[in-house]
């Protein structure tokens, strides 16, 4: 049975600690592929929410010192209850965010990390020409992804012109780049949510990471052709394509 079929059959519940820029897009993409999104900003309800969830997705895009305890507790509970824990380390190469991720990593174990080449280079202790959340350079060299996977003991997804998925021993590649991913803020957040959804129903997180990245990228290519020179329509077309593809699966 394919991962998409499992998602349709089980309708996994995905708990998100989202940033406050793109929560609607994150919730939509989870719902459109047949799962159920759940958001929270309340630490008191975390234990019960993690208990009923099938995966936990954490995005540090708008994290602060005051919200750090919420993130730490969500991650700790995900580990304790053996729920897949996915990290989107938005702009982790900025010092404050770097300190946050270092502190989290000392306390919890992430199962999958999804970031652009600059973010993944940080986990590999390497420098990158990229800035912030934008991917500016080619990333076809798998060195950073493999090294980051080895250092963290985590499946790494490095998105860019060619997406690289590494477990530290082998790599898989997805060549489905679209310029519209970059200019539509939140597409990376959406991909991370899709990865979390695939991980929720799979015992093989390396394969789940690859299949999720490929599924999302191929939908992006179709959506790019559909909207042509109307990039503002891209996300809606992307969601429609993901929905249609999901519901063609029996």
UniProtKB/Swiss-Prot annotation:
Keywords from the named record: ATP-binding, Kinase, Magnesium, Metal-binding, Nucleotide-binding, Thiamine biosynthesis, Transferase
SUPFAM superfamilies: Ribokinase-like
Organism: Lactococcus lactis subsp. cremoris (strain MG1363)
Protein name: Hydroxyethylthiazole kinase
NCBIfam families according to UniProt: PRK09355.1
Role this protein plays: Catalyzes the phosphorylation of the hydroxyl group of 4-methyl-5-beta-hydroxyethylthiazole (THZ).
InterPro entries per UniProt: Hyethyz_kinase (IPR000417), Ribokinase-like (IPR029056)
Membrane-crossing segments per the record: none
